[in-house]
Amino acid sequence: MPFTLGQRWISDTESELGLGTVVAIDARMVTLLFPATGENRLYARNDSPVTRVMFNPGDTVTSHEGWQLKVDEVKEENGLLIYIGTRLDTLEENVALREVFLDSKLVFSKPQDRLFAGQIDRMDRFALRYRARKYQSEQYRMPWSGLRGQRTNLIPHQLNIANDVGRRHAPRVLLADEVGLGKTIEAGMIIHQQLLAGAAERVLIVVPETLQHQWLVEMLRRFNLRFSLFDDERYAEAQHESDNPFDTEQLVICSLDFVRRNKQRLEHLCDAEWDLLVVDEAHHLVWSEDAPSREYQAIEQLAERVPGVLLLTATPEQLGMESHFARLRLLDPNRFHDFAQFVEEQQNYRPVADAVALLLAGTHLSDEQLNTLSELIGEQDIEPLLQTANSDRDGAESARQELVSMLMDRHGTSRVLFRNTRNGVKGFPQRELHTIKLPLPTQYQTAIKVSGIMGARKSAEERARDMLYPEQIYQEFEGDSGTWWNFDPRVEWLMGYLTSHRSQKVLVICAKAATALQLEQVLREREGIRAAVFHEGMSIIERDRAAAWFAEEDTGAQVLLCSEIGSEGRNFQFASQLVMFDLPFNPDLLEQRIGRLDRIGQAHDIQIHVPYLEKTAQSVLVRWYHEGLDAFEHTCPTGRAIYDSVYEQLIGYLAAPENTEGFDALIQACRKQHDELKAQLEQGRDRLLEIHSNGGEKAQQLADAIAEQDDDTGLVNFAMNLFDIVGINQDDRGEHMIVLTPSDHMLVPDFPGLPEDGCTITFNRDVALSREDAQFITWEHPLIRNGLDLILSGDTGSCTISLLKNKALPVGTLLLELIYVVEAKAPKQLQLNRFLPPTPVRMLLDKNGNNLAGQVEFESFNRQLSAVNRHTGSKLVNAVQQEVHAILQGGEAQVEKAARELIDAARQEADDKLSAELSRLEALRAVNPNIRDDELAAIEHNRQQVLENLNQASWRLDALRLIVVTHQ
């Protein structure tokens, strides 16, 4: 290898040293100085792992002074290169730059530059890079992108709502599904879609204080979204970091009380430029035309400033018309400005709902009914469709569906309101109540008497709360020595029940964490019962482990002991036995407890066991819930309203349970009120809205399509290949689970999304649903997305050399495999990836410029090739550099045609789809005022921006592989 003083070389093994200069040569050794780092290296002259740096005409090089030169000609003088060309800063021509004056911090980013500089990658990394490009491009174009990655069952009505709303520009909608149908999951799916597509980057979730942790857990566990919880303490900390504390995080959860209490805080929230606002339990925002509440006004201020708003609320019929109007007014104050007009409109929708019912029933329509339909739809050329729908011909069913769709588009609040009911969604279990009446121990009787004397000044509500939990009264008097569990008959009953039902998984819920901890100790020490505990004092990871242990079929815990707050946001559909060790104070909390098991996907009827102590508030409450509200065995949409209306009387009975006079009459009155309210709710059901929200056959097809994707072996193969190459250890744990841990030889020191102590993953949705400690890996999971970014944002695998053993070709035949990427650079919110994601174009060129890629498929070709070590590869490249240059130039000429076709097709698709959506909404605007002007303007602006940016799409060489034929 001929060395000359002043020549520039690069190390094959330490490319981070930059450009080296030959500073000393003797008979056997050569010394290189690397000015960028100030280090020297001594190499053997005969076989040193270094590559001569030689640029070619067309390249741009940088001088040590920082200016750049576009190379036109390369001369050699006494073994040193001189580059002649045009200075890019002054445009001066015929400028000479000697190689000794090249910038030492030179970084080779183009694949061909890296190849010629000897920075040759492993062959498996090249293959991974191409697969990553291919898969990423395919995933971007999936129509249900953003709906596959969540750890949830694929429930059609949820997917339907998320698919409709999640793809809108700045969606402003009301999600009003009945309890247990998954409003939180629907909101999470919409948030996930908007974030993934780039339609939103900053999200604020405002919830009641008691639900903050539930949302935090749901967003993290189900959607891999890390929200920050803002309370007084976190807000104070963030004030040191930024003028506006809310600018310190992109995804924030805070309580409604936190928002309402402080005027400056609300101003900071309003100024924080959120893209999406989510408000849970929005029915608690009290409004009247004369006196809106402070909470309502606070959310109204936010809703005026934030483009996208999701309100989660109880069903409209539960709320009353005025309250329902108040929610809609937050979403679109221009459209919903007059309550009286709104009431009139709602009454006018009855014929529409009747028409839909007729169409769905499949019965023949009378002429009068056909005329009504024609008027309601208001299209000029609707007659043929009506005739087909009213016939027995082929296509009658699809014509009916199209008419239903047209009615839904044109009438009602279906664009802003989504509401599913349990009647309209199948798959819920029955609930059976088992009450166990137990005697009140004398120890409790004494403690209650003393408490009554000492607590005479307490309010009725405080006394009522005390009377619900007699063990706490006893413990207060006895202190640490008070062992209530030794005589409380509920403990004896619980132990007896658990020992006689060893094969059953049992969820036990009690109000306080201390009760759960004491019960766990008693069950373990007395009967050896395996019990996990779950309370608010535990971290999310600790709760995950407890939930996972409870979920294990054979070796897991038989019972999970939960506190009221600790169980929020967790669902255990695999269990069907629920024990309420005590009772919650209001019907909402009771429904929340039962809702841990009563979810879609529950395979068995739920057995609810309530052991209660006679002559206590428990005995009063169990009767009121069951006989007055029917709240144990059925969902109780009327519960809160009745609870509020009889609150004072109920508190009186709870505070003094021995006084039963008039209690039977109260129960009867509550039951009568419950039955009447429930009948009103049923009568007021809006079938049209339910059909729209449910999604019908279309929603089922969406769920089926995503389920089919769940079995994608391509993802598993790619992920394992990715983890291997990144250097992540994989340990098969069985049951479709793998443990990933970082290794000491990873491509990057910290792989984003992989904890220091590792994590358990699964590719199986059912396993992920039953094992909360296992992360559910899909194309949308951060581990995969971060892995794709890691590979594709750098130069990993961008150039390699392989040998092809093929005696049918002459030895030394060259092939060049080129991977070009066609892409359009644009702001993320334009979502150009729907039409033109970074798309790989593969070419396999011989020395004559023939493209063989069509005949030679990548994977089968890759299997025929063998790797070359870097040092040998550098020698090969040096020997064939001129030929490679010629083939590369031919490739540049050929790729333009393929790239142009891709860009033109993307432009056409974008124009067709966006124009069609705009035309549809503009036509509907005439008959449905729920279509907002700003939404139409945004779609038109978006269409223009998309087409403009697609016009500027370009292509570049992303990776290349030099293949040399051998016979050995």
Curated annotation (Swiss-Prot):
The keyword Transcription regulation is annotated on this UniProt entry: yes
Keyword ATP-binding: yes
SMART domains the UniProt entry points to: DEXDc, HELICc
Pfam families: Helicase_C, RapA_C, SNF2-rel_dom, Tudor_1_RapA, Tudor_RapA
Helicase C-terminal domain span: 490-662
InterPro entries: Helicase_ATP-bd (IPR014001), Helicase_C-like (IPR001650), Helicase_RapA (IPR023949), P-loop_NTPase (IPR027417), RapA_C (IPR022737), SNF2-like_sf (IPR038718), SNF2/RAD54-like_C (IPR049730), SNF2_N (IPR000330)
Biological processes per GO annotation: regulation of DNA-templated transcription
Residue numbers covered by motif DEAH box: 280-283
Enzyme Commission number(s) from the entry: 3.6.4.-
A GO MF label: DNA binding
Matches recorded under CDD domains: DEXDc_RapA, SF2_C_SNF
UniProt domain Helicase ATP-binding: residue ranges: 164-334
Top EC class of this enzyme: hydrolase
Family to which the UniProt record says this protein belongs: Belongs to the SNF2/RAD54 helicase family. RapA subfamily.
Stated role: Transcription regulator that activates transcription by stimulating RNA polymerase (RNAP) recycling in case of stress conditions such as supercoiled DNA or high salt concentrations. Probably acts by releasing the RNAP, when it is trapped or immobilized on tightly supercoiled DNA. Does not activate transcription on linear DNA. Probably not involved in DNA repair.
Quaternary structure annotation from Swiss-Prot or TrEMBL: Interacts with the RNAP. Has a higher affinity for the core RNAP than for the holoenzyme. Its ATPase activity is stimulated by binding to RNAP.
Protein name per Swiss-Prot or TrEMBL: RNA polymerase-associated protein RapA
Organism: Cronobacter sakazakii (strain ATCC BAA-894)
